[in-house]
Swiss-Prot record:
SMART domains: B5
Official protein name in the record: Phenylalanine--tRNA ligase beta subunit
Record-annotated disulphide pairs: none
Predominant localisation class: cytoplasm
One Pfam family from the record: B5
Cellular compartments annotated: Cytoplasm
GO cellular component: cytoplasm
Residue intervals of the tRNA-binding domain: 39-153
EC main group: ligase
Natural source organism: Mesomycoplasma hyopneumoniae (strain 7448)
HAMAP family reported in the protein's UniProt record: Phe_tRNA_synth_beta1 (MF_00283)
Cofactor note: Binds 2 magnesium ions per tetramer.
Alphabetical keyword list: Aminoacyl-tRNA synthetase, ATP-binding, Cytoplasm, Ligase, Magnesium, Metal-binding, Nucleotide-binding, Protein biosynthesis, RNA-binding, tRNA-binding
Binding, Mg(2+): 438, 444, 448
């Protein structure tokens, strides 16, 4: 978004600071100032008031204007036909400059012209953004300015335009008030335009019947405000096209507060508006699109946002509509219209009710200053922003995250600054500013703390010397390929209706998302492999072994295997090959898993994964899965192996014993095998038979080893 540096300095009371210092502070606050452009190269212009207009008798299209300036009366010739007596103008007088041009008195068609009257385009504004009133000749306005004053200061024309790139999660930053508030906090100056209270002069009788999933707030205003010339110039600096009074007012509220607005007017006997979604077509487009319609009591459209605006009568009351539309719907409308306006862009961002509150608070101030009555907010209640989310404070963690030695005084001073932008602190917790959507974790607070504590303080930190280290090679892909698995990559995001979550992880619903099929972070990689397996089975591929490593919910890193060939016992062996840990397998009690064919995987009594098959309703009964949370496994220290002892070579023949376990259907053999595997010098334990007789599992294993192993087994069974 484009910002006027002059207006930011004015709002934040920073006139005493240099332009460069303020720009540097914006960068230190984390705002990317992508480009700095000077509005114009003008100096020496003056306010003047037209006293008399007469035609130059020696020219067809020249008018001689007698203009009163602060120092004297001058005659200036112009071709503009919109000059009016007793109106004020801006003028280059002798000695004024525009770039490399210096203006002098000059004889034109027999008469001296002591300068030149100024148009909006000559002030540095984009001609294509001007309406007919501003583009019909020279600038002409009511006589409200002191002729002694400097137009460059009064109209904020000696300005730098800052192109500031904001992060996607800072929609509140598309606002003069929010940026000015942060600057004022940074420089410790006064700022009072974001109040904590909103009022009204009367209660509106308007009823909004909302039949959509959007939120709609409104304010009834008794008269349409007319923006001052300096505020019209502010819109032009933001590359907003100048339109009628209603559009200009709505756009002004947008750039000041970040809240998109629309103006709506009703007949005197109507007090009800209905909001629906309905198809709309535009000229030269073959397709229609569903969009928002505001209807009157007779179901006639009053306003179709972004498609058709209502003409607002200047001296009649109207309603300022402040919507929070469905983000996906806005994205569809934006693509359909191939439009990239400031308002439509902001509508597509996830601003919260705090932005609406800032708009209402500013409107209180602005309308009172204009002496225009307004209602209490319609549909908006302060409770929408008073529900605060509190996060735990941990200053040791803060120091660790930032890598700084912070004193209690450093922390207290910085927190006082943060309170100016809306933070609330108590002894053990804090709540973020009511208008921010990006403060979800303690690390987000730490980032804000550093912005106001000072990024330059990081220079004082001495970096520790880090010795170069050659990373250990990752043999997992080679092992998995050797075992016959093929790697896959799936979407990180799933739809809301996909609830497969055997490990009961917590996911995050995204505030913005690409589609309804991708709205939250997946709970399980195995679930993604299941969908890929089914897709390949439909293509008549029956022998499938797949694996994937990736992120899942709760900041976990996971490995998942899926196979139509291998059994659960095979997957256990593969897990042992990949990670030489002593895993425990216990019966799985989960609504998502087949209790007779599934087990949870534990390591040191910590649940780290699952193995087996899913319940029948998912229709994946011929697929065996294994999923392990690598992020949990890596946190558990690996047990050191004992010292290696060499023994004399024994050339005697190995022997074996077959043992059969008789278990209930829901039981698993692993706990019993663990007892047997404690016998020293076992060479192998191999499954040789599995049958079900009278609802009992009969599982036969062959244990192979030297004489002493067989002796221990015989002793155990006797």
């Amino acid at each position: 978004m484009l910002f006027s540096l002059r207006r930011l300095k004015k709002l934040a009371n920073l006139e005493a600071f240099s332009d460069q210092k303020v720009i540097d502070s914006l960068i230190n606050l984390g705002f990317e100032v992508d480009q700095i452009t000077k509005l114009n190269e003008i100096s020496g212009i003056k306010f003047g008031q037209i006293l008399e207009i007469r035609k130059n008798p020696e020219a067809d299209n020249l008018w001689i204007c007698k203009v009163q300036f602060a120092d004297k009366i001058r005659e200036i010739q112009t071709t503009a036909k919109n000059v009016i007596e007793n109106k004020q103008v801006l003028a280059f007088i002798p000695g004024s400059k525009s770039g490399n041009t210096t203006f002098l008195a000059k004889k034109l068609r027999g008469h001296i012209s002591e300068g030149m009257l100024i148009s909006a385009a000559e002030l540095g504004f984009n001609k294509h953004l001007l309406n007919s009133e501003l583009d019909q000749g020279v600038l002409v306005f009511d006589p409200i300015f002191d002729l002694e004053s400097n137009p460059l200061k009064v109209l904020e024309l000696d300005d730098l335009i800052l192109d500031i790139k904001l992060l996607w999660n800072r929609p509140d930053g598309n606002s003069y008030l929010v940026l000015a508030n942060e600057l004022a906090a940074f420089f410790k100056t006064d700022f009072s335009l974001i109040n904590k209270e909103i009022t009204g002069k009367f209660y509106s009788e308007l009823k909004i019947i909302n039949k959509t999933d959007s939120k709609i707030f409104a304010l009834e205003i008794q008269k349409l405000p007319k923006l001052a010339l300096v505020d019209i110039f502010l819109l032009l600096k933001s590359e907003v096209k100048i339109d009628n009074l209603a559009q200009n007012f709505a756009n002004f509220i947008l750039i000041y507060t970040g809240q998109p607005c629309y103006c709506l007017q009703l007949e005197k006997n109507q007090q009800k508006v209905e909001l629906i979604e309905q198809k709309v077509k535009i000229k030269y487009e073959p397709d229609a699109i569903s969009s928002y319609h505001f209807l009157d009591q007779e179901k006639k459209p009053l306003l179709i946002p972004e498609f058709s605006d209502q003409i607002i009568m200047e001296n009649n009351s109207f309603f300022l509509i402040m919507p929070k539309f469905n983000l996906l719907k806005v994205k569809q409308i934006k693509q359909f219209l191939k439009k990239n306006s400031l308002k439509l862009t902001q509508l597509g961002k996830n601003y919260n009710y705090g932005t609406t509150f800032i708009a209402l608070s500013f409107l209180n101030f602005f309308l009172e200053d204009q002496k225009i009555d307004f209602s209490w907010p319609i549909n908006f209640d302060k409770s929408l922003i008073s529900k605060k989310t509190f996060l735990d404070l941990n200053y040791n963690e803060l120091k660790e995250i930032l890598g700084l030695e912070l004193s209690q005084e450093d922390i207290s001073k910085t927190n006082l600054i943060l309170e100016k932008i809306g933070y609330n602190f108590d002894n053990t917790s804090f709540s973020p500013p009511f208008y921010r959507v990006d403060i979800e974790f303690f690390a987000d607070y730490a980032a804000d703390f550093l912005r106001f504590y000072g990024l330059e303080k990081l220079k004082d930190c001495k970096l520790e010397q880090v010795k170069a280290k050659i990373p250990n090679p990752d043999f997992e892909p080679v092992k998995l390929k050797t075992l016959g698995y093929y790697e896959t990559n799936s979407f990180l995001l799933i739809s809301k209706k996909e609830d497969f979550n055997p490990l009961e992880l917590k996911s995050q619903d995204l505030l913005t998302f690409p589609s309804q099929e991708h709205t939250k972070i997946r709970y399980s990689l195995a679930w993604q492999l299941a969908k890929i397996t089914k897709y390949n089975q439909k293509r008549k591929i029956t022998e499938i072994n797949l694996y994937e490593k990736g992120s899942i919910a709760g900041w976990n890193h996971s490995l998942a295997l899926a196979s139509t060939i291998y059994t659960s016992e095979d997957l256990k062996k593969h897990l042992k090959i990949l990670y030489n840990y002593d895993f425990d397998f216990l019966p799985a009690d989960s609504e998502f898993l087949n209790p007779e064919k599934s087990q949870f995987i534990y390591l040191d009594n910590v649940l780290v994964g699952w193995l087996g098959q899913v319940v029948e309703k998912y229709n994946y009964e011929n697929v065996t899965f294994l999923e392990i949370l690598l992020s949990k496994v890596e946190k558990i220290p690996k047990k050191e192996g004992g010292k290696i002892k060499f023994r004399p070579y024994d050339n005697s023949q190995l022997k074996y014993r077959d043992i059969t376990l008789s278990l209930p259907m829901k039981d698993i053999p692993d706990p019993y095998l663990k007892v047997i595997q404690k016998i020293p010098e076992i060479f192998s334990v191999k499954l040789i038979n599995y049958v079900i007789i009278n609802n009992q599992q009969k599982i036969t294993y062959r244990i192979t080893g030297p004489d002493q192993v067989c002796a221990e087994i015989d002793k155990f069974y006797k």
